[in-house]
Amino acid sequence: MTAMIEDLVQRDASIKGIWCVPKYQNPTGIVFSPMVVERFAHLQPAAPDFRIFWDNAYCVHDLYPNAPAVLPDILSACANAGHPDMVYEFCSTSKVSFPGAGISGVAASSANLIDLRKVWKFATIGPDKLNQL
């Protein structure tokens, strides 16, 4: 998180969100520090519907098993900062299972989960695209 991003988010209501890979981010492998997580949680966006999309794709992919990277909980950080609805965190097992066999999960505030369920009730899980080739 840079001061420039914070400034833009605070001034420009057309900025509706940010997508983050907080652990082992490609291509550098960076893991967000506790300070960076807190800066995200304390954002004061101009857009009332601004969201952080926290793609925790590598949550179980520790590069160093004896010294796993510790990533603070963004959901708690946002709730403690007074922004419980600002973040959606998601992950999947697609990188640790067979192709097409992965499952995914989402974590969010109660209000955000209610909103997601309204949309998801019209969705279907289609066939595995990889095996259709």
Task: Show where each model-derived region lies.
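PLP-dependent class I/II
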Residues: 1-133
